[in-house]
Curated annotation (Swiss-Prot):
The keyword Ribonucleoprotein does not apply. Belongs to the acylphosphatase family. InterPro entries: Acylphosphatase, Acylphosphatase-like_dom, Acylphosphatase-like_dom_sf, Acylphosphatase_CS. It comes from Anaeromyxobacter sp. (strain Fw109-5). This is Acylphosphatase. It comes from the Bacteria.
Amino acid sequence: MAELARAHILVSGEVQGVSFRAAAVDEARRLGVRGWVRNVADGRVEAEAEGERAKVEALVRWCGRGPPAARVADVQVSWGAYGGDLGPFSVRH
């Protein structure tokens, strides 16, 4: 059985106004990862993701690149225990 994990992700750089959230939703759903993504008032993008650890790690790697218009400066990840309480990946406001 695959290892399950949860990650809290903070992405900084030019990551707002470049369709980062919509692209993150597409990538997470493609990977089968559950959770959410939202803009933060300080200019970062925040996400909470859970699922098979390898798939969550793939989403974290994607966040390091982002969509074509993004210029990612840094990605901070805090790993936690899988909770099983997140819904289909979506944008939070």
